[in-house]
Structure formats: structure tokens, C-alpha cells
């Protein structure tokens, strides 16, 4: 489906954990290849000079019990680690690989999160909006 997309791809999920390596090892924990497929599709659009965008909507923090930086937040921290490893952390991340080929990958892919805001007792307050799919 990713390979056949003509103009854009929209992904909305609680996590974005995927594999970007060209060849998987038997020891790799993450097996899904969505990020690799996105990488190939974006490169094809870039090389052919086509307008193409990928929109990925994920929450800023996973909706799990616990607090980041504490022993109760281990699951949150693990998910954030794998999200960031997929997106931007390390030479095998999606954005790192795209940056080797494309000067400005943000012309092709963007990562977004939702937040709402209001005034409460005269003070601005904000809250994360969680995506559950």
C-alpha cells in the first residue's frame, strides 16, 4: 500500500516503532518494515521530482501509567526509546537515512502530535491529546 501511494500517506497511531535496516538480523527485536517502505517511497518521489508527503501523527508521550524518569515510567521510556530510534536517533533512523539522500527531508515527511489548551482561572493550561488506534 505504501509503495502505491501517489500523493501522500497519513499514519495515526499510538507508537511509531519500525525497522529501517535494509537487512534484518535474527537478533533484531523490531520486525515490521513500515519505516523502510516509507524510506523507499520518499526516495522514489524525491528522485522523480514528484510532490509527495508523509504525515505521521503520534502522541508526545505514550498513554501508560507512570512518570518519565522514575521507576514507574519504565514502559513509557522504552516506548519513547524505540519511537525515537525509528524516527531520528541513530544512523539507521528514518530521518538519518533520508538526510543522506535529501537535503531537507521535512519537505517529504513530518511528525505531529496534538495538544489542546484553554484558560483556567485566568491561567493558560494545556493538555496532551492521545491517539489510540
Locate predicted features:
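Active-site cores of enzymes that catalyze phosphoryl transfer or operate on phosphate-rich substrates
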Residues: 1-7
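PLD/PLD-like phosphodiesterase catalytic module centered on the HKD motif
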Residues: 8, 15-133
Amino acid at each position: 500500500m505504501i509503495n502505491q501511494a501517489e500523493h501522500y500517506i497519513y499514519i495515526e497511531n499510538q507508537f511509531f516503532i519500525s525497522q529501517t535496516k535494509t537487512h534484518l538480523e535474527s537478533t533484531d527485536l523490531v520486525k515490521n518494515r513500515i519505516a523502510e517502505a516509507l524510506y523507499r517511497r520518499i526516495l522514489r518521489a524525491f528522485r522523480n521530482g514528484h510532490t509527495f508527503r508523509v504525515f505521521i501523527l503520534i502522541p508526545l508521550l505514550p498513554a501508560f501509567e507512570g512518570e518519565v524518569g522514575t521507576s514507574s515510567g519504565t514502559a513509557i521510556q522504552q516506548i519513547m526509546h524505540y519511537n525515537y530510534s525509528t524516527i531520528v536517533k541513530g544512523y539507521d533512523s528514518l530521518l538519518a537515512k533520508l538526510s543522506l539522500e535529501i537535503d531537507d527531508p521535512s519537505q517529504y515527511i513530518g511528525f505531529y502530535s496534538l495538544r489542546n489548551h484553554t484558560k483556567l482561572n485566568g491561567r493558560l493550561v494545556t493538555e496532551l491529546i492521545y491517539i489510540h488506534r
